């Protein structure tokens, strides 16, 4: 509880910045968080913003009806420890890829080998998802292929999940995403219920956190955006920005390489100089992850922390 109290004070005391440093730091501003939340709700309508009710504690740097995102009653049929083990060498490759400059190992979104084996996880693939409305692009056209990037970073994503039991261990989770002022990134909270709708204890909720993360990134906390006391397990965001920054760099390299290959294959005619200048500018934009796509990628990594929670249970194409 001491860690939870310190975290709450840190959130309260940290000043809010509205200067965007997303491309250089991997952090986002409150305005970018709102944009990312709108994009998530548009792409996946099972996510929604909070209602501006009397039970909500408002923070003045966010709109009253956009304090946090929520998806309710998400199924969870198996405990985290029941997932199939995969090769620890994959996790080692990823850890080595996100070392601090001083040589220390970062622990956010980390897939560590350690004493416990790494777990397989659900995949939220970024392709083949079409938002509602006309004249829109698919996720595969608007976002980088995160599965390819994760593979290049040495992270394995398997579908070798054990068979789902016949609802004897069925649970449900309400998932919340809010903005962390101290880390300037999204922060996830989960609140669990058993099959009959009774709240889970914190100890029971920890059963659905991957063992490698229970002591590193998961904390028992009161939901900070409700006036009533509701116990939850939070996923600590201490290194999210660093991992996002690494992804940004990798996206830049991968997409530029692909563009160069396409240019070589289709070098039949050259555009005029004015077109060249505009194309270079457009390519620079296309070579990056946009800030409003942050939460799509964020949820991709959260599945490694909560492998049994079916984040994609109504989201065809994830």
From Swiss-Prot:
Name recorded for this polypeptide: Autophagy-related protein 3
Composition-biased stretches (Basic and acidic residues): 260-273
User: Does Cell wall biogenesis/degradation show up as a keyword for this record?
Assistant: no
Corresponding gene? ATG3
Name the source's superkingdom: Eukaryota
Indicate the quaternary assembly.
Monomer. Interacts with ATG8 through an intermediate thioester bond through the C-terminal Gly of ATG8. Also interacts with the 40 amino acid C-terminal region of the E1-like ATG7 enzyme. Also interacts with the ATG12-ATG5 conjugate.
Q: What is its main location?
A: cytoplasm
Alphabetical list of InterPro entries matching this protein: Atg3/Atg10
Give positions of region: Flexible region.
83-164
Subcellular location(s): the record lists: Cytoplasm
Keyword vocabulary terms for this entry: Autophagy, Cytoplasm, Protein transport, Transport, Ubl conjugation pathway
- Report the function annotation for this chain: E2 conjugating enzyme required for the cytoplasm to vacuole transport (Cvt) and autophagy. Required for selective autophagic degradation of the nucleus (nucleophagy) as well as for mitophagy which contributes to regulate mitochondrial quantity and quality by eliminating the mitochondria to a basal level to fulfill cellular energy requirements and preventing excess ROS production. Responsible for the E2-like covalent binding of phosphatidylethanolamine to the C-terminal Gly of ATG8.
Q: Where is the composition biased (Polar residues)?
A: 122-137
What does the record give as the active site?
238 (glycyl thioester intermediate)
UniProt region (Disordered), positions on chain = 122-142, 260-279
Q: Where is this region: Handle region?
A: 242-293
Identify the GO cellular component terms for this protein.
cytosol; mitochondrion; phagophore; phagophore assembly site
- Say yes or no: keyword Transport present: yes
What family does the entry list? Belongs to the ATG3 family.
GO MF, one annotated term? Atg8-family ligase activity
What does the entry note on its domains? The N-terminal region is involved in phosphatidylethanolamine-binding and is required for ATG8-PE conjugation. The flexible region (FR) is required for ATG7-binding.
| Pfam families in the record | Autophagy_act_C
Q: Name one GO biological process term.
A: autophagosome assembly
Membrane-crossing ranges are none
């Amino acid at each position: 509880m001491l860690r939870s109290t310190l975290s709450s004070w840190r959130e309260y005391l940290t000043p809010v910045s509205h200067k965007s440093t997303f491309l250089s730091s991997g952090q986002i501003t409150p305005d970018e968080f709102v944009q990312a939340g709108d994009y998530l709700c548009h792409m996946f309508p099972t996510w929604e913003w909070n209602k501006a009710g009397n039970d909500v504690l408002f923070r003045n740097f966010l709109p009253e009806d956009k304090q946090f995102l929520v998806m309710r009653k998400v199924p969870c049929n198996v405990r985290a420890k029941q997932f199939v083990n995969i090769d620890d060498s994959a996790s080692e490759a990823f850890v080595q890829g996100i070392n601090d400059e001083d040589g220390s190992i970062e622990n956010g979104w980390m897939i560590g080998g350690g004493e416990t084996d790494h777990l397989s996880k659900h995949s939220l693939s970024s392709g083949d998802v079409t938002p509602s409305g006309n004249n829109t692009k698919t996720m595969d056209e608007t976002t980088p292929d995160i599965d390819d990037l994760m593979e290049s970073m040495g992270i394995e994503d398997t579908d070798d999940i054990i068979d789902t039991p016949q609802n004897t261990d069925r649970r449900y989770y309400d998932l919340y995403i809010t903005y962390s002022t101290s880390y300037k990134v999204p922060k996830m909270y989960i609140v669990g219920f058993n099959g009959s709708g009774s709240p889970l204890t914190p100890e029971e909720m920890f059963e659905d956190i991957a063992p490698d993360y229970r002591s590193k990134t998961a904390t028992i906390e009161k939901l900070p955006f409700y006036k009533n006391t509701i116990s939850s397990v939070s996923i600590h965001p201490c290194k999210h920005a660093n991992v996002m920054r690494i992804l940004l760099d990798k996206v830049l390299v991968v997409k530029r390489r692909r563009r160069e290959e396409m240019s070589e294959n289709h070098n039949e005619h050259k555009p005029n100089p004015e077109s060249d200048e505009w194309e270079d500018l457009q390519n620079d934009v296309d070579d990056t992850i946009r800030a409003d796509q942050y939460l799509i990628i964020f949820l991709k990594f959260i599945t490694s922390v909560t492998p049994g929670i079916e984040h994609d249970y109504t989201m065809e194409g994830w």
